């Protein structure tokens, strides 16, 4: 689900998606942006967790919708980066104009291949530069550059536009201002808790994805009505709670309502 987080009024849920449990979060991001723009609700920034971020969709959001997606990108998967030692991919100098990759020791790769398409719709195309065993074997710091016994190494990276976006996004994440801005995203966890524990959203009341989605949409509408009636625009709002009807006295003999359906 997607909600506003401007801080100057009640947070309003603007989009709800119902997907199979086996689907990945990255699959839904383009559809969310398309629906928000169609409704006239396009945000300048969209704060998401790491499950939604991939280079392809970050670039697509900027290009097609002028939306800046703010969220942590997956880390570099190379062995050197995971271990925190040796020469990771970002230690290599990439020259897109000359189609050359230079290692930290000054060796220029012998090949530039691709970009190759990947099997995943959310994965960026991959360019591969190869360093041969004749370059790696005599290197005095070979252990830092490759784990291959013969000294060869392949260095993979996305095309220029995506590579520059990747570097810029990772650099911004190291800035204190980025963390301050991104901290606002944690508020959606309170909304998820409100849906799950206050409205029984962990359990579908109907069979079929279409009916389940209708349940989710109607519940979101009910939550919006409750929030807007409790905190009209312009008034400061209280933190999101998981209670169905917060603020009302509830004697011990009257248990909390499990969902909006129970109140009908």
Regions found by a protein language model. Name each.
Residues 1-264:
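Anion-binding and metal-coordination hotspots
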């Amino acid at each position: 689900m997607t909600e506003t987080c401007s801080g100057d009024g009640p947070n309003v849920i603007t989009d709800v998606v119902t997907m199979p449990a086996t689907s990945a979060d990255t699959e839904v991001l383009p559809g969310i942006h398309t629906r928000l723009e169609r409704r006239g609700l396009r945000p300048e920034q969209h704060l998401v967790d790491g499950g939604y971020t991939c280079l392809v969709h970050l670039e697509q959001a900027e290009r097609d919708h002028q939306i800046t997606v703010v969220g942590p990108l997956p880390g570099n998967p190379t062995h050197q980066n995971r271990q925190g030692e040796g020469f990771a991919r970002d230690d290599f100098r990439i020259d897109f104009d000359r189609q050359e990759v230079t290692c930290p020791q000054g060796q220029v790769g012998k090949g530039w291949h691709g970009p190759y398409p990947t099997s995943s719709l959310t994965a960026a195309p991959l360019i591969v530069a190869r360093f041969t065993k004749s370059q790696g074997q005599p290197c005095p710091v070979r252990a830092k550059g490759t784990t291959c016994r013969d000294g060869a190494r392949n260095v993979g990276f996305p095309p220029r536009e995506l590579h520059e976006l990747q570097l810029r996004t990772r650099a911004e994440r190291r800035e204190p201002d980025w963390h301050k801005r991104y901290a606002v995203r944690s508020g959606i966890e309170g909304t998820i808790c409100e849906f799950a524990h206050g409205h029984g959203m962990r359990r579908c009341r109907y069979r079929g994805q279409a009916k389940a989605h209708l349940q989710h949409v109607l519940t979101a509408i009910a939550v919006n009505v409750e929030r807007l009636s409790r905190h009209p625009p312009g008034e400061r709002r209280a933190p999101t709670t998981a209670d169905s009807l917060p603020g009302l006295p509830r004697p011990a003999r009257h248990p909390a309502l499990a969902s909006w359906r129970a109140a009908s």
